[in-house]
Amino acid sequence: MDNKLEKMKELVEELNQYAYEYYVLDNPSISDKEYDLKYDELVILEKKTEVTLPYSPTQRVGDKILGEFSKYTHKGRLWSLDKAQNMEQLIEWHNRNLKVIEQYNSMSEDKLPELRYIVTKKFDGLTVNCTYDENGILIKSATRGTGIIGEDITAQIKTIKTVPLKIKNNHVIEVHGEAIMTKTAFEEYNKAAQVPLKNLRNGAAGALRNLDIKETARRNLSAFFYDVGYNEGPEFKSYREMMNFIKNMGLPQDKYIKECTNMEEVEKEIEYIESIRGELDYDIDGAVIVVDDIKTREILGYTIKFPKWAIAYKFEAKEITTKLLDVEWNVGRSGRVTPTALLEPVELGGVTVKRATLNNMDDIKRKNVKLGAKVLVRRSNDVIPEIMGVVEESLEESKEIQAPDRCPYCNSHLVQNGVHYYCENTLSCKPQMVKSIVHFASREAMNIAGFSEKTAEQLFEKLDIKSIADLYKIKKEELLTLEKFKDKKSQNLIDAIQNSKNCDLASFIYALGIPNVGKKTANDLVMKFKTLESIKNTTIEQLVEVPDVGEIVAKSIYDFFEDEKVISNIEELLNLGVKPYYEEERIDENPFMDKTIVVTGSLNNYSRGEIKDKLQSLGAKVSSSVSKNTDYVLVGEKPGSKYEKAIELGVKVINEEEFSNKIK
């Protein structure tokens, strides 16, 4: 037993170190296969011994759904920051600091040092507080809450792979950080989501406020740590020293930390941060400026709300107020009817905004949104703007928004399910059928070349195509009757439809349009169950064993294949000659296997999605940013700052022709 426990401890230490190298340093020292073998060995030992160490990597993703959030009292207060909207306000803050220091130094023999500031980015995420005990084990994580009392989100934080479950420290500490969702994670999540996320901040906040831990893990959050709020160990003399401690503990930390000795330098750094804002893989909404010397901080002190030794410089907001003119109800391929706000046109972030998201009637009521009212609109991450609230003074002459009782397209009665309304007329409701056909034919699904929404609309209206199976019954003579369909175009579409019959199983599963199932989940299902028959007959218990599949997604898949109409449609597709196949993926040795590659600029022979697929098929890892751990930067026409970064770091740069020659 003792030998097994020692082996477990050894494996846990090794796996945690490998995870740190992979997720934080972006510099793995072993292959994924080697990691998986060690991880599997640990799982077996934990089952045999019935012992699980609290910092074991197997504790990162639990299967449980929590009942509720419990309260947690922070050991050290989490302060808010005062804000400056312009340099004048920042200089006023600086001058106040100078005055206090000057007064102190004039009355004290123990002089304070020259004023020095540290400038960092201000992350637009959710503040978290992580507590490590005297053994260095992560024992609690909580939200900011009131700053004194937060909510326990320990299980949720453990899903963030960059957050260490154990650090090499023997004193109790609380470390403050920001949980964020990267743009890469946001895009990946939305590919599979039935309800796409609207912005990165809501993505992070919603994940940490989710009681279904597997659902939290699906968001693939990241974190940056920047402050020790409580410390029973040796005191820090400067913020620089504190940041070095955080880094040495293996906690993820942003690399941008700049030291400034005057306000001209501070202004220059703020301008730089704002200039790179759009290039970052995450959202920031400003810069944070703090006094470096800890003793000077103590002398400057606090107001009721803020520390006087720190301030946030806020960038121009992506929010504005305008009038809500009307609400338009639209039908998606699942039949869900969702509201869209029609706005009085207004300029926001260099774009004219006329429409905004209103998620559902519950959202409308919660925000008290009414027709004719002035509404606050936010545009984040270049996605569709969202209404965040109303200007209360504008509600007097406004009108209530009425929930629809009939489909705006086919006039069928709507059915309410939870907070959403659905049209169940799947056969003759045009938007549902058209969007289902377009999805089925899309590149990542059945890849029917030359298929468009305009084509789908004509097939529905003129050829009475009412199911995806009907696509395989279309004749060339019928296509010739459609607008802009001549002989060659008609034959090409017939050929493309016929060619799609031989498709890989993952593409077929994705094409079926299962709620909450994107291409990644479809791939994961196929890797787990291998055959269509196995997927059709799987249980919810088996489904939640698939990576990133939680209770909600599992139920969506299970319910989908329980529907007799779905099974009937699948059987009809198979009878019409559709043959989904599955092959175990084998990657031949090539120069890009296990290499980290960044792509910048426009390529002649690949779209951005195609080159990503190609590189992944070669066993490469595609990264969105250049670092010293990048192996290659593939450069096309009009490359961006990533090319300059590669030259600066001495990373190998190749063009498209060199890439093609290497894979011949």
Swiss-Prot record:
InterPro entries: BRCT_dom, BRCT_dom_sf, DisA/LigA_HHH, DNA_ligase, DNA_ligase_CS, DNAligase_adenylation, DNAligase_N, Hlx-hairpin-Hlx_DNA-bd_motif
Keyword Transferase part of the UniProt annotation: no
Keywords attached to this entry: DNA damage, DNA repair, DNA replication, Ligase, Magnesium, Manganese, Metal-binding, NAD, Zinc
Segments forming domain BRCT: 587-664
Pfam families the record matches: BRCT, DNA_ligase_aden, DNA_ligase_OB, HHH_2, HHH_5
Reaction(s) catalysed by this chain's protein: NAD(+) + (deoxyribonucleotide)n-3'-hydroxyl + 5'-phospho-(deoxyribonucleotide)m = (deoxyribonucleotide)n+m + AMP + beta-nicotinamide D-nucleotide
Keyword Lipid biosynthesis included in the entry's annotation: no
EC main group: ligase
Entries under PROSITE patterns matching the protein: BRCT, DNA_LIGASE_N2
Essential cofactor(s): Mg(2+); Mn(2+)
SMART domains in alphabetical order: BRCT, HhH1, LIGANc
EC code: 6.5.1.2
Transmembrane portions of the chain: none
Active site: 122
Record-listed Zn(2+) binding positions: 407, 410, 423, 429
A GO term from the CC aspect: cytosol
Any one Gene Ontology molecular-function term assigned to this protein's record: DNA binding
Entry binding sites for NAD(+): 32-36, 80-81, 144, 178, 314
Gene Ontology annotations of biological process type: DNA repair; DNA replication
Family, as annotated: Belongs to the NAD-dependent DNA ligase family. LigA subfamily.
Protein function: DNA ligase that catalyzes the formation of phosphodiester linkages between 5'-phosphoryl and 3'-hydroxyl groups in double-stranded DNA using NAD as a coenzyme and as the energy source for the reaction. It is essential for DNA replication and repair of damaged DNA.
Full protein name: DNA ligase
